[in-house]
Curated annotation (Swiss-Prot):
It comes from Parafrankia sp. (strain EAN1pec). The lineage of its organism: Bacteria, Bacillati, Actinomycetota, Actinomycetes, Frankiales. This is 1-deoxy-D-xylulose-5-phosphate synthase. It comes from the Bacteria. Pfam families: DXP_synthase_N (PF13292), Transket_pyr (PF02779), Transketolase_C (PF02780). One of its GO terms (biological process) is 1-deoxy-D-xylulose 5-phosphate biosynthetic process.
Length: 650
């Protein structure tokens, strides 16, 4: 029997000796490689966090002591140790195990975290709550995988350091997020060892000098300042101590005994402590260790022996189309520069970086800084293209509004993973951008439907000089091009019902990548003898006035988008028609305003009613209801014009 098969809770880990822990670590790695190879997921980060996680669960008592995972994709080992090993066969699948911590799965999970740099703020609040409630509970926050490049971490550290609350911060220093971590902070993380005896002596000296009138406190400050100055000259690792945090490390994060010893010292101290663990992403799996790009940060279905994809990728992705096009644009325009927040490879900038290494800027996990820095680049005469996941632009709304739009800077935002992302779950769905960006004055939004329109609209966006632009598209493969059969103003007409159908009953406004779905819907609706026209506005902010004329020629307008309904494009179409005094009803179909669980994109869309068959049924029902209402109005009008029975002139 394997050791791993006997582990169902953290208590089972506590009974093991050193040799058994080493064996268990190896078994966990083997399990991870084979499990994630079957389903896909974040492999590299978790291979690097095995011993670290074992040590945490040996030293602390979860769930009484709370363990928080920043960049929650590094929590797989934690899930294994807390009784979820048997669920890994459905990792990131609908109804299966989440790829991030989940309160619904386990009492050992408290924050459902995948947006980076937040765990320390949670830890600050939790530890304050426990202190006020008189509960002696430790809070352990595991940060790393690039999270410390986010400014929110440092805001939290500043507050945590000003207390004596029991917060243990484990810095999982693998030097990478998706790729090598960028910035001065990454260079600054190195060794500052803390001896308990030294701290005890320092406290005694402080107490003695503190009892000496007038000169005691200034003398201590002077001596302490000399010590700090010498330390900073000899080893440039003083930033944590300068904040007021005790520091243990660096520790070999792949030596479970060393990690356990460091964590016990940190726990015994009783106040806020940094434990600096040096780890390697992909550790123990040669295929991952040899992958210079991202150490198998996230993989699809692979061969566990070779690490190669099980099947060749079929079709072209939205990201790869963008990658090719931005290189072409960059070759023609030397003023075009690109920026990303620790996502160089995932957003498709690797080729641009290779072609123009001095024109790509990776600022780390710092979306707010990225947006305002881009505004500065534009002010300096360049044309910045900020490439970011749609969900992460949520974090920089104020900067988009005030620093870019208010200054009318021609910054282009390329939002990858817009709409429903699928397996990454609620925190990664990009279903809010077309709502919150609608309120930004002077900003234009393009939603391409296919590869051809992505190329065209990206070119249009980069060529715009009057304010910011956005180009948004989903994760995954691009469907075949859907060429326009006509154009009305700037609106593409994609479909008109056959002549046999009654015309001008439904105007179906398709938004972005929902075009294949809308064309499917149109065929189903037309088969019922209903006249339907499908159009793509291309730019969804501002909406083309041609939509008003098109709406006037139809009895019903239907909008379909992979964005939240509240404040989405459908709502804007309805407002456009109201403002133009066009009395045509609008039915808006979009994503439900709730956090959606992980699963394949098509399955999630079906759950919220955006599958073609469901949409077609609703459109047909809406047409029937509309016709019934119109017939009722006509009958009522006829009756009102009739002379009442027995009537006549008086």
């Amino acid at each position: 029997m394997s050791l791993l098969s006997t582990i169902d809770s953290p208590q089972d880990v506590k009974r093991l000796d050193h040799e058994e822990l080493v064996t268990l670590a190896a078994e966990i790695r083997d399990f991870l490689i084979h499990a994630v190879a079957r389903t896909g997921g974040h492999l590299g980060p978790n291979l690097g966090a095995v011993e670290l996680t074992l040590a945490i669960h040996r030293v602390f008592d979860s769930p009484f002591d709370r363990v928080l995972w920043d960049t929650g994709h590094q929590s797989y080992v934690h899930k294994i140790l807390t009784g979820r090993r048997e669920q890994f066969d459905r990792l990131r699948q609908r109804g299966g195990l989440s790829g991030y911590p989940s309160q619904a799965e386990s009492e050992h999970d408290i924050i459902e975290n995948s947006h980076a740099s937040t765990a320390l703020s949670y830890a600050d609040g939790l530890s304050r709550a426990y202190e006020l409630r008189g509960e002696n509970r430790a809070v352990v926050a595991v940060v790393g995988d690039g999270a410390l490049t986010g400014g929110m971490c440092w805001e939290a550290l500043n507050n945590i350091a000003a207390s004596d609350r029991q917060v243990v911060i484990v810095v999982n220093d693998n030097g990478r997020s998706y790729s090598p971590t960028i910035g001065g902070l990454a260079d600054h993380l190195a060794s500052l060892r803390l001896a308990p005896e030294y701290e005890q002596v320092l406290d005694v000296v402080k107490q003695v000098l503190g009892r000496t009138p007038l000169v005691g406190a200034p003398l201590f400050d002077a001596l302490h300042g000399i010590k700090k100055g010498i330390k900073d000259v000899v080893t440039p690792q003083g930033m944590f101590e300068d904040l007021g945090l005790k520091y243990v490390g660096p520790v070999d994060g792949h030596d479970v005994v060393a990690m356990e010893s460091a964590l016990r010292r940190a726990k015994d101290f009783g106040g806020p402590v940094i434990v600096h663990a040096m780890t390697r992403k992909g550790f123990g799996y040669p295929a991952a260790e040899q992958d210079d790009a991202d150490n198998f940060h996230a993989v699809g279905v692979i061969d566990p022996v070779t690490g190669k994809p099980k099947s060749a990728s079929k079709g072209t992705t939205w990201t790869s189309i963008f990658s090719e096009e931005i290189v072409r644009i960059g070759s023609e325009r030397p003023d075009v520069v690109t920026m990303t927040a620790a996502m160089l490879q995932p957003v498709g900038l690797k080729s641009f970086a290779k072609a123009f290494p001095d024109r790509v800027f990776d600022v780390g996990i710092a979306e707010q800084h990225a947006v305002t820095s881009a505004a500065g680049l534009a002010m300096g005469g360049l044309k910045p293209v900020v490439c970011i996941y749609a969900t992460f632009l949520n974090r920089a709304f104020d900067q988009v509004l005030m620093d870019v739009a208010m200054h009318r800077q021609p910054v282009t935002f390329v939002l990858d993973r817009a709409g429903i992302t699928g397996e990454d779950g609620a925190s990664h769905n990009g279903m809010w951008d077309m709502s919150f960006l609608q309120v930004v004055p002077g900003l234009a939004i393009a939603a391409p439907r296919d590869a051809a329109t992505l190329r065209a609209e990206l070119d249009e966006a980069v060529s715009n000089t009057d304010g910011p632009t956005v180009v948004r598209y989903p994760k995954g493969k691009v469907a075949a091009d859907s060429p326009a059969i006509d154009q009305v103003g700037g609106v593409d007409v994609l479909y008109r019902a056959p002549a046999a159908a009654r015309h001008r009953e439904v105007l179906l406004v398709s938004i972005g990548a929902m075009a294949p779905t809308c064309l499917d819907v149109a065929e189903r609706v037309a088969s019922q003898g209903i006249g339907i026209t499908v159009v793509d506005p291309r730019w969804v902010k501002p909406l083309d006035p041609a939509l008003v004329d098109l709406a006037r020629d139809h009895d019903l307008v239907v909008t379909v988008e992979d964005n939240g309904r509240v404040g989405g494009v459908g709502a804007c179409v309805a407002q456009l028609l109201r403002d133009a005094d066009v009395d045509v009803p609008v039915r808006e179909f979009g994503v439900a305003q709730r956090f959606l669980d992980h699963g394949k994109r098509d399955d999630v869309l079906a759950e919220v009613g955006l599958a073609p068959q469901d949409l077609a049924r609703k459109v047909i029902e809406a047409v029937a209801k509309r016709q019934h209402a119109l017939m009722g109005d006509e009958v009522g009008a006829d009756e009102s014009n009739q002379t009442p029975a027995g009537g006549g002139q008086a």
